[in-house]
């Protein structure tokens, strides 16, 4: 099984844009926990999961919109009420998902994910910090930062 960020780097190296969908808040019964994420490609292909079923379908549809708008989106999902009862979902919680466009044309972003790959390949300790906000453009170089164990940052 490949590492999530290695997959992102691989797609960027191939010139493919992706949307990272990550659960940033979860309360009650939900299919996955905070921090869980998946990668959505422009054709709708999903690598990984944020929970499957109706939730994953909605995340996929929102991601396709993020590709068009080229800016981040915060989405709140209420896994409660009649709508959920009419599906096969067994959960009854609340989930917030951050959808982040990652484009292969953003040189700073490509450098960060290449450095993440290097850190993983070398078993270096590193922390990837992502700014979470609605409307962050795909070309903003301040959307994320990588801090490696030696104190250097990218």
Predicted regions and their residues:
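Segments forming oxygen-rich coordination pockets for charged ligands
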Residues: 1-154
């Amino acid at each position: 099984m490949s590492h999530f960020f290695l997959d992102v780097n691989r797609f960027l190296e191939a010139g493919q844009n992706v949307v990272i969908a990550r659960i940033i808040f979860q309360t009650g019964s939900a299919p996955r926990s905070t921090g869980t994420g998946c990668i959505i490609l422009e054709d709708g292909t999903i690598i990984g999961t944020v929970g499957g079923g109706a939730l994953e379908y909605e995340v996929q549809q929102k991601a396709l919109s993020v590709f068009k708008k080229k800016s981040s989106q915060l989405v709140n999902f209420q896994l409660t009420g009649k709508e959920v009862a009419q599906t096969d979902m067994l959960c009854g919680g609340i989930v917030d998902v951050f959808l982040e466009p990652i484009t292969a044309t953003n040189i700073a972003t490509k450098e960060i994910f290449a450095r993440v790959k290097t850190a993983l390949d070398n078993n270096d300790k590193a922390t990837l910090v992502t700014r979470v906000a609605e409307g962050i453009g795909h070309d903003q170089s301040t959307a994320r930062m990588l801090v490696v164990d030696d104190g250097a940052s990218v």
